[in-house]
C-alpha cells in the first residue's frame, strides 16, 4: 500500500471513530429520557429524577467552551480521547448504579466527557479535509447528529421494553471502545504545542455561571418552584459570575471565548441561528411522540418510530446543505432551510385528533428536511473565516449555544404546554355535570400515565375525548408558538451575507 492510499485509509477510520463519538453523545440524553420511567420504578427517589438529566447537561455545557479553547491550545486528539474515556467510564458506572444518588453522580462523570465529543469532532473534520471536501463531510456529520437526536427515543423505548434500562448506558461501551481504537490508532497529530497561558479566571467564572444557570433551568418548575429561594438564588449567582466572566475576558491574554469573533457577521449570525434552531427543533423530538402516544393511543415504541420521517428528512437536508456549501452561499442554503422548517411547523400546528397519521408523517419529513441544513451548515459557517487555531473555540461556542437553546426550548415550551393542558382540562370539565366531571381535572396526575394502554381503557369515553382534545390543543399551541423563533431565524439569515465555502483553487488564486 503506497503512502497516499495508506493516508486515505487512515482518514476513513478517523472519520468513522469521530462519527461513533457523535452518535453516542448526541443520542445519550434522549435515549435516557425514554427510560426514566423504568429507572424511577427500579431505583425509586421520584423526587430526584430531574437531577439525572440536570447533572449530565450541566457537566456537558460547562465543559464545551473549555474543551474548545484547550483543543486550540494543545491539540484536538488528547482532549477528544479524554472526553471519550470519561464518557465510557460514566456510561459503565451508570449501568451498574444501585441508587438514584449514584446515577446522578455517574451521569455528571459521563457529562464531563460528553462535552468534548461533539465540538472537537466537527473541528477535526475541518483540520483533516480541504474546503471542497469539508461540505460533504460536515453534511455526513450533521446527518449523524440529527439522526442520533431523534433516534434516541426510539432506541430507548426498544431497549427498555425488550432488555432493561441498564442497557441504554451499556450500549455506549462497545460503540465508544471502537471510537477509542480508531482515534488512537489512526489519528496522527503533532504533540508539540507552544506554551500558552490558560485563562483560569475566565474558565472558573464561566463554569460557575453555566452550572448555576443550567441547574436553574433544569430544576425550575420540577424539583423547585420558579419563585423558590433556590431557583432565584441560582439565577442571581449566574448573573454575578457571568458579569465577572465578561470583565475577566476583556483583560485575558488567551480568553476562553474570543468576543472579537462576534464582529464577524457570518460567525455572529451562525451563533444566533444555532441557538434559535436548537430551541425549536428539540420540541419536535419531545412532543411528537407524546402526541402520538396520547392522542392516537399508540404504544411508547410506536411513538418512537413516528420520528423516523423526521430522521429521514433531517439526513437529506443535512447532506444537501453540506454538498452545496461550495456552490451556494450560507444565506441562500439557510433560507431554503428556514422556509421548509416554517412550513412544516405551521402544518404541525394545525393538527387535530382527526389528522391522519400519513399527514403527520409528511409534516414531520418537511420539518426534518428544514432542520437538517443547520446541522451541517452552522458549524461550517462558524469556522469558515477563522484561522485553524481558533476553530475549536468557534465550534464549541456553536455547539454550546445549540445545546443551550435546546435546554431553554424544552424548559419554556414544556412549561407552556403543561399550563395550556391544565387550563384546557379545567375548561373542558367545568361544563360537565356530576362528580365524574367536577373532580376529573384535579385527579389527573402525569398526562403520560393516563395514556398508557391499561389506564386508557379504564377512562370513560366522554372524559377520555376531552382529555385527548386538551392534550392535542396544548401541543399544537406549542408548535404555533415555535413559529416565533423560526421567524426570528429567517430575519437573522438575511444578515448572513454572501459568504460561502471557497475551494482550495479559489483561495490559491486569490492569494496569488
From Swiss-Prot:
Lineage: Bacteria, Bacillati, Bacillota, Bacilli, Bacillales
One GO location term (cellular component): plasma membrane
Recorded family membership: Belongs to the major facilitator superfamily. EmrB family.
UniProt keyword list: Antibiotic resistance, Cell membrane, Membrane, Transmembrane, Transmembrane helix, Transport
Cited PANTHER family: MAJOR FACILITATOR SUPERFAMILY, MULTIDRUG RESISTANCE PROTEIN 3
This protein's record includes keyword Cell membrane: yes
Gene Ontology MF annotations: transmembrane transporter activity
Topology relative to the membrane: Multi-pass membrane protein
Organism: Bacillus subtilis (strain 168)
CDD domains, sorted: MFS_Azr1_MDR_like (cd17502)
Transmembrane intervals: 13-33, 48-68, 79-99, 109-129, 139-159, 163-183, 200-220, 228-248, 272-292, 304-324, 333-353, 358-378, 399-421, 475-495
Induction comment from the UniProt entry of this chain: Expression is dependent on the growth phase and decreases in the late log phase.
Stretches assigned to coiled coil: none
GO biological process, one term: response to antibiotic
Name this protein carries in UniProt: Multidrug resistance protein 3
Function: Confers resistance to puromycin, tosufloxacin and norfloxacin.
Major site of localization recorded for this protein: membrane
Localization of this protein: Cell membrane
